[in-house]
Amino acid sequence: MLKFITIIIFTMVLSACSNMANLTLYQQLDGKAGLERLVDSFINQIGNDEQIIHYFEHANISHFREGFINHLCVLTDGPCEYTRDSMVEIHTGMHITEADFNHVVDLLINAMNEQNIDHTVQNKILAKMAPLRSQIIKI
C-alpha cells in the first residue's frame, strides 16, 4: 500500500511539473494581474531610488505603467500587441549609463522578489529582456 501511495504522489508531482512547463511566462506570472503587481512594485522601487529617479522626473507614470505592462505582456507571450514607441525611440537622448542600466535591472529583480516570482521565471524574463540592452544604453 505504501508503495502504491508513493507512486501516486510521484506521478502527481511529475504531472504538476509537466503542466508548469507548458504554461507561458505570462500564465506563470498570473496574467495581467500579475504583471500589474510586478510593474507597481517596480515603479515603487524606482520611486524610492535616488540613483534612478531623475530619469523619470518628467515622465507620465501612468503612461509608463501601462506601456511597461504591455511590453512585458508581449515579452512573456501574453495576448497583447505592443503598439507603442520602440525601445530606441523611448530611450534616445536619456544617455543611460551601463551602471544605471544594471541598477534598473537590480530594481526589477527586487520587484520580482517582492512579488515572490520564482527565480527560474525571473531568469527567463531577464533573458528575454537582455537583447534590449544595446538599444537602451547611451543612446
Model regions and ranges:
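Bacterial N-terminal signal peptides that target proteins for export
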Residues: 1-6
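Acidic/polar, glycine-anchored loop/turn motif associated with catalytic or activation segments
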Residues: 19
